[in-house]
Amino acid sequence: MSSTRGPREADECDVVVVGGGAAGLSLAHRLTATGDIAVTVVEPPDGPLRPPERTWCYWDRDADDLAEAVSASWSRLRVHGTDGRAITVETAPLRYHMVRSTHFERLVHTRLARAPGARVVRATADAVHDVHGGAEVHCSAADGPRLVLRARHVFDSRPLPALPPARTLLLQHFRGWFVRTAAARFDPAVADLMDFRVPQPRHGLAFGYVLPLAPDRALIEYTEFSRTALSTAAYEAALGHYGRDVLRLGAFTVEAAEQGVIPMTDARFPRRAGPAVFRIGTAGGATRPATGYTFAAVQRQSRAIAAALRDGHAVVPAPYGRRALAMDAVLLRALDTGRIDGPGFFTGLFRRTPPQRLLRFLDGESTPWEEWRIGLRTPVGPMLRTAVELPFLPRRTRPAPGTGPRHGESPR
């Protein structure tokens, strides 16, 4: 719904959630599950501020109460080294789930429509600021009317205009095609998480990514970890090479495409913007720095916020622990300096680490003992050198990339 109230009229509720992406809708869904919290979600109207359809992925034992939004899932993952050798791992009891943003939005909007005290406002959030007893969100609808929303707490998932100061910033940037082949070319039981059989850039690393949906349909992506994104033409050329010469798909058609950029950074993302204003999602640090994954952390964070509010507290827990962030900072710096070989590093992790332990590590839920054992299987010398120098490096402010996170606030 869109508001038609005048600019001075305030609409009051318990919580306002700014942004209708993965983070905003997940939080609204968790908050309204019991019906005792009045929630208003502010979503941008149709236009340039509304993101295109995206793909989000995460692993879990089951799809929880989001099963209706899951398009496909896999319990076997594969990584291809630069030498062409494949490593296939069984992830049971975990499964790798794929969610399309339109399916997720439809599911949550349906549930919000049934929840007492929940509503969705189609408007642009122009300003968010603290007031006595809470916070206000000043909005403007597409047809001109303005609305002031007042709440005890505001959770803002909008992208930051600039990234917080960081020592290292790489971009995970990609373009993907949803393809349909003339003949059966895919194994729907196995997802290719990283395929390093693509030409490697001079700086950083590149890999292919395949999520098979049927024997003749899949999402195939070309991804780089590097300092700068590519032109659309360059992604198209790389995808054409990957589909034609690496995957050997034969004749195929491209039914849809998606493209994104995710910051991979050791910046510290503040989760509080004021006494009653909190940041969630990527803006609140929910994107894992070394992988770009966001969706699982968003679900954990949303559940924790909802539980705290029902107990009378307003908190946004850290999406990842200090150990995970410290390890990510070392890895990002080692990749950026070229001290470690990216394809060799990730291929080695999958080759030498039990899959359940590795997935817990990638999701930030591993134990110190598991992390120690994984660390011993990495290039110890370059990683130690990087760990020693990190505390002495300055943090610099950089502009935020123009497209949101992969399978998190945008794909992956």
Model-assigned labels for residue ranges:
Residues 5-41:
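N-terminal Rossmann-like FAD-binding beta1-loop-alpha1 element of flavoenzymes
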Residues 16-18, 42, 147-160, 277-278, ...:
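Short hydrophobic core segments
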Residues 26, 30-84, 103:
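N-terminal FAD cofactor-binding segment of flavoenzymes
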Residues 30, 111-252, 265-268:
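Predominantly flavin-linked oxidoreductase catalytic cores and closely associated redox partners
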Residues 199-205, 260-279, 334-354:
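FAD-binding beta-loop-beta segment adjacent to the flavin cofactor pocket
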Residues 210, 215-216, 272-290:
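Short FAD-binding loop at a beta-strand-to-alpha-helix junction that anchors the flavin cofactor
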Residues 228-258, 275-278, 300-321:
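Flavin-binding catalytic cores
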Residues 303-412:
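C-terminal helical "tail/cap" subdomain of flavin- and related membrane-associated enzymes
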